[in-house]
Amino acid sequence: MSVGYDRLKTSSLAELRAAIRSGAYRSHTAGLGQGYLQANLAILPEAYALDFMRYCQRNPKPCPLIGVSDTGNPMMFTLGRDIDIRTDVPAYNVYRDGRLDSVSADITEDWRDDLVVFALGCSFTFEHAVMRAGVALWHVDNDRTVPMFRSNIETVPAGPFSGKMVVSMRAVPEDRVAEVAEISRAYPLAHGAPVYWGDPAGLGIADIMSPDWGDPAPLGPGEVPMFWACGVTPQVAIEAARLPLCITHKPGHMLITDVAEDAEVPVVETAQDKR
Amino acid sequence: MSVGYDRLKTSSLAELRAAIRSGAYRSHTAGLGQGYLQANLAILPEAYALDFMRYCQRNPKPCPLIGVSDTGNPMMFTLGRDIDIRTDVPAYNVYRDGRLDSVSADITEDWRDDLVVFALGCSFTFEHAVMRAGVALWHVDNDRTVPMFRSNIETVPAGPFSGKMVVSMRAVPEDRVAEVAEISRAYPLAHGAPVYWGDPAGLGIADIMSPDWGDPAPLGPGEVPMFWACGVTPQVAIEAARLPLCITHKPGHMLITDVAEDAEVPVVETAQDKR
């Protein structure tokens, strides 16, 4: 039996996770589990894990690490009391040799004892804070995906992982730009402060209405385009590295954790019991 | 020729690093390289690096990771333009099989192609911010080492690394406690907000005047003991893991980086050129 988005919007975290785990809900997670941290996902063989972790440490704005599993253990015990990464994300992309091989609602069959799970913070957290401050975000109000661009900023490489930084764009009234930058800087686990604002040409972006990913968003009169480091950056780096196996969330279909959005550190109290 | 502390206090970063690299300066770094991030150090064989990095990610308050080297590469290119970790720390402790084997001003002879360097943020950064706000710190004013205690807080384990959290204590006037907590929370790369304040018994500390490390510090009238996660925590976890080889800085003798103390991310701009 499938469960609808509107009903889950008011569900408890436990009901929400049960609906996703059973496969009853397989759609996007924007607006669900409000108040809790959501995460991008990258699952890799252990042979690549140290280099990928170094890539995240060296590029903390596009790749804010919020959780790393033990090798071969699908339970993300630092992010929640009962999160099984094989079933608790609505939809997964499975890549083999750098190419998308399948899309699935359950990766139990793909799981291996040498896999390591990386959870990365996402932009929902700072967007909520910006909207609470009374700044409207066009893509949210119009139910579109935020526009994303390949920038001319080079990431700091680690092992096989490298590439240009992908950025997301949000248009903000000129007199709120400094305030929005300051608000987002307080969320280092959700990409932090913008990397740039103003003329898109400064990032090597020729046409602001032709994003490389997501939907185009208009610039209203008196609005300034602000650009944040984006979680698509590590996905592009992973694809370019052509790993034999890599599993990610399907874009927009995130892991919902037990960690409060305003937590200082992304570790639940029960994590200490898992010795 | 040795160089004195007082002269180096006003030296440029380049002069300071040259004096340390040549062995002319082998003493503590408190008050040197003002305005730049200083770091605790742990150098381990690659076989333990992924687990240690997971330990840091799971315990970000005692173990705030600010830099990780490539395996076998002694140049810390994300933390500075020209930092050679074999020579650029005033003094090192070399541990073999979990026991202190030697203290040295240069580890060029100990370097191996399988070593990975971890640099961790230290408390100097938030202490500077607290003092700028006009709150005096007794151990700084009296040229002592901050008192440190083994607490009853369990860290989140990863592989062979586990143990109790070590905390450092600073006495703060009751009416400044909330402000000091807020100031330090803004420095997640320097241990962040305190983990506790008030009656030391709550952390399992029997006698506040008998620290496990450092010097005792008095509690003045109207002062509250505040406790922060401490960088000795990973050193204790590493010692307990009895690694065949581990090299740390000698306590107080830190790595001085090129990263500004108030930088949003601990990565210098030239890091991108090191592909």
UniProtKB/Swiss-Prot annotation, chains A, B:
Lyase listed as a keyword: yes
Annotated SUPFAM superfamilies: PSTPO5379-like (SSF160920)
Pfam families: D-Glu_cyclase (PF07286)
EC number: 4.2.1.-
GO molecular function: D-glutamate cyclase activity
Keyword annotations: Lyase
InterPro entries per record: D-Glu_cyclase, Putative_hydro-lyase, UPF0317
BP-aspect Gene Ontology terms: glutamate metabolic process
Disulfide bonds: none
Superkingdom of origin organism: Bacteria
Family to which this protein belongs: Belongs to the D-glutamate cyclase family.
Protein name in the entry: Putative hydro-lyase SPO1111
Protein species of origin: Ruegeria pomeroyi (strain ATCC 700808 / DSM 15171 / DSS-3) (Silicibacter pomeroyi)
